[in-house]
Design a protein with these regions (language model features):
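Asp-based, Mg2+/Mn2+-dependent phosphohydrolase catalytic module
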Residues: 1, 5, 18, 30, ...
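N-terminal helical cap/lid subdomain that shapes the substrate entry/recognition surface
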Residues: 1-118, 122-123
Length: 243
């Protein structure tokens, strides 16, 4: 069984995007100044938005890049020659600063997640995680899972920045199943997004349970195989699929 991260296990309001951006821009200004590079906050703010356009182009092809490339895109937007001028030490500090905002003000967790995962693990299900990232890398998201006591339930975790593929491309599901030695016909994916999770996992040959408050979601070939409002209902939903 595979699960999604954002909108399924953990939830972050849209306002977090701007908060994280402000934190990153402020940290970049401080780190670059200490390295002898003058970059105004206004220039970094603009560069951050330009890096978003770069990422959107990559993501629109269902592909992904490591967060090192996020940082490089920001520096390039400030000054095309800047990535070559910063030292390896400074680059490492920038990458760390870019990755950490979600750890400083962590997103909310579905409070029923731990109990649901424990119940499924107790029934012998092998659990894995399949998730796209936005700007917080997989290494940060694993630390959040660990903080909430969830990481240990997963035999394998797949994050798009680490494998170069994003949902809904079925390959990100396929490579996760290969890591588990599992076949798609016997696997179930759990996620919230109708395209990334439902269509993506179906294209990979898996069944899907969608986490959504819309109980009217149609089931069947074009919709999920089951619907739950929260992860508290997952053990029963899985039992229903297997019945």
């Amino acid at each position: 069984m595979t699960l999604d991260f954002w909108g399924t296990l953990l939830h972050d309001p849209p306002s977090s995007d701007n908060r994280y951006k402000k934190r990153r821009v402020a940290d970049f200004e401080t780190i670059l100044a200490a390295a002898g590079v003058r970059a105004r906050a206004s220039a970094l703010d603009r560069a951050y938005d330009e890096s978003g356009a770069f990422l959107s182009r990559v993501w629109s092809q269902n592909r992904d890049v490591p967060v090192t490339e996020h940082v490089r895109a920001i520096l390039t937007a400030v000054d095309p020659g800047l990535p070559q001028r910063v030292t390896g030490e400074t680059m490492a500090m920038l990458i760390e600063a870019y990755a950490r905002p979600a750890l400083l003000v962590p997103p909310a967790v579905d409070e029923s997640a731990r109990g649901a995962l424990a119940a499924l693990a107790g029934r012998g299900y092998t659990l894995a995680l399949v998730s796209n990232i936005m700007r917080s890398p997989g290494v940060t998201l694993r630390r959040l899972l660990e903080r909430y006591g969830l990481l240990g339930y997963f035999r394998h975790t797949t994050f798009s920045d680490e494998v170069g593929v994003r949902k809904p491309d079925p390959e990100i599901f396929a490579l996760t199943l290969r890591a588990l030695g599992a076949e798609p016909e016997g696997a179930v994916h759990v996620g919230d997004d109708a395209v990334l999770d439902v269509q993506g996992a179906h294209a990979a040959g898996m069944r899907v349970i969608q986490v959504t408050s819309d109980a009217r979601r149609p089931l069947g070939p074009w919709g999920p195989d089951g619907v739950i409002p929260r992860l508290a209902g997952l053990p029963d939903a899985i039992a229903g699929l297997d019945a």
